[in-house]
C-alpha cells in the first residue's frame, strides 16, 4: 500500500488530470486549491446546461451534497449519468444525508443511476444511507455513531457489506478514518483536532481523493479479470477501454495526506487563520519521505 500511494501521487503530478467538482459554495475555493496542490486541475462547473460536456472531458467527478440547491440537484444527476456512460470514476460525498431527507433521497437517486468509485461520509451519514439508525447533529456525526474499539467488528461488517452492495470503496471519516473495498480494511490514524476548527476540511478530503482517482487506472491483470468474471468485487471496476480502477489507494492517500498535513500545519500555526494557510502549504510541500515516515495506517 505504501509504495502504491507514492506511485499514485507521482502519476497525478505527471498527468495533471481534470477533476470536475460539483460542490457547495462554502468549500468550493478550498477544494479547488487542494486539487491544484497535488498537481491535478480542478473545474467547478455546475450549470445544468454545461455539466454533461464538462464531465465527459474529465478524469474524475466529485459530487458533494452540501448546501444543496435545485440547480445543483439537476446538475449532479446529469453529471452522474455522463460519468457512468463514459466510465469516469465518481466520488460521492454524502454531506448532510443524516439530517436532511432531501439529501438522503438525492443520494439514493444518484446511487440508482450507477456505482461511484468512492462513497464518502461520516459514520452517521453512511449509516443513514445504509438504512440504519443514525444520530447526526446537523452535518456532524453523532457521538453514538463514532467508531470505537468496542464496536469495530460490527461497524466493519456493516461498512464492508455496504461497500459490496454498492460496488464502491467506502470512506468513513472520523477521529480515525475507515476505508474498505468490501474485503480489505484500512484504518488511517493521522489527523489533528485543528482540522475541525475550520470549515471545509471534510470536503477537501473528498476533493483530494477524487484528484487521485484517475491515477488508479491500471492494466487489467489476470487476478482482476478473474475477480470480475466470477462476480467477486474487490475494489476493481472494469472500464470499456480495458482498464481498471483499483480505488482503495486513492481513498487512503486522500485521507492520509489531509491528516498528515493537518498534523504538520498545527505545529507552526497560531490559530485557525494561519492553520488554514499552512494546511494548504503542507499538502503542497509534503515530501514522499515525510509521507512515508508520518503515515499511520493499519490494514486487516
Language-model features: where?
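Conserved phosphate/ATP/ADP-binding segment of small-molecule kinases
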Residues: 102-185, 191-194, 227, 232
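Hydrophobic beta-strand scaffold residues
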Residues: 42, 87-91, 170
Amino acid at each position: 500500500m505504501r509504495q502504491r500511494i507514492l506511485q499514485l501521487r507521482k502519476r497525478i503530478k505527471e498527468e495533471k488530470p481534470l477533476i470536475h467538482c460539483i460542490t457547495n459554495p462554502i468549500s468550493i475555493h478550498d477544494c479547488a486549491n487542494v486539487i491544484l496542490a497535488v498537481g491535478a486541475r480542478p473545474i467547478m462547473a455546475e450549470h445544468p446546461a454545461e455539466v454533461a460536456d464538462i464531465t465527459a472531458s474529465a478524469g474524475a467527478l466529485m459530487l458533494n451534497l452540501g448546501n444543496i440547491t435545485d440547480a445543483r440537484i439537476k446538475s449532479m444527476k446529469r453529471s452522474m449519468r455522463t460519468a457512468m456512460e463514459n466510465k469516469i470514476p465518481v466520488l460521492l460525498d454524502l454531506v448532510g444525508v443524516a439530517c436532511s431527507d432531501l439529501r438522503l433521497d438525492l443520494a439514493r437517486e444518484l446511487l440508482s443511476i450507477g456505482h461511484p468509485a468512492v462513497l464518502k461520509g461520516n459514520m452517521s451519514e453512511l449509516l443513514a444511507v445504509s438504512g440504519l439508525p443514525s444520530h447526526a447533529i446537523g452535518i456532524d456525526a453523532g457521538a453514538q455513531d463514532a467508531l470505537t474499539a468496542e464496536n469495530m467488528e460490527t461497524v466493519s461488517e456493516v461498512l464492508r457489506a455496504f461497500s459490496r452492495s454498492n460496488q464502491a470503496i467506502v470512506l468513513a471519516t472520523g477521529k480515525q478514518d475507515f476505508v474498505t473495498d468490501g474485503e480489505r480494511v484500512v484504518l488511517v490514524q493521522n489527523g489533528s483536532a485543528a482540522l475541525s476548527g475550520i470549515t471545509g476540511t471534510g470536503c477537501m478530503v473528498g476533493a483530494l481523493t477524487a484528484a487521485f482517482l484517475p491515477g488508479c487506472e491500471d492494466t487489467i491483470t489476470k487476478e482482476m479479470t478473474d475477480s470480475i468474471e466470477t462476480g467477486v468485487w474487490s475494489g476493481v471496476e472494469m472500464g470499456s477501454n480495458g482498464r481498471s480502477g483499483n480505488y482503495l489507494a486513492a481513498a487512503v492517500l486522500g485521507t492520509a495526506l489531509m491528516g498528515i498535513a493537518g498534523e504538520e500545519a498545527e505545529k507552526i500555526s497560531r490559530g485557525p487563520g494561519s492553520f488554514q494557510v499552512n494546511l494548504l502549504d503542507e499538502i503542497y510541500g509534503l515530501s514522499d519521505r515525510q509521507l512515508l515516515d508520518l503515515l499511520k495506517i493499519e490494514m486487516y
